[in-house]
Amino acid sequence: MRKVVLYIATSMDGYIAKPNDDLSFLSIVQKEGEDYGYKDFIDTVDTVILGRKTYDWIVKQVAFPHADKHAYIITRTKRPDEGKTVFYSGNLKDLINKLKKEHGKNIFCDGGAEIVNELLKDNLIDEFIISVIPVLLGNGTKLFNDDRPETKLDFVSAKSFDTGLVQLHYKRKV
């Protein structure tokens, strides 16, 4: 069965964005030639799940980087699909359960926080690869909401980089 893998960056104090969906803090760890394992990770997935706000932010910056994969943009407002990119307004749990049963590579959850926390409520995230950025933001969008079930994890690995980024990899205990 395919796995849902959350691959995301967060500040030391648990925020994935500053107020107004500002992701500028990510530039703290930008280093030429360093992708923090992203290319290796992205080769293991063929499907991407992300929220509409995250999608809109990405396409304002660059061309959608996942156009070659099956992408499901979770939205409350139906929009026309664009190639392999589907704007999905149905039940998220049903979609994930359907995708997990299909043949293919893993499923990349790219955020945002609403999608992550909805998936956590139903124990639908199998692995967590979280890159911790060395900054305390103080406010913004929290990665994990307070009102969610406890989720026990098994340690897979931890990597540290000279930029100060630490990448943590865990699997959900079954």
Predicted features along the sequence, with ranges:
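Enzymes that bind and transform nitrogen-containing heteroaromatic metabolites
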Residues: M1-V174
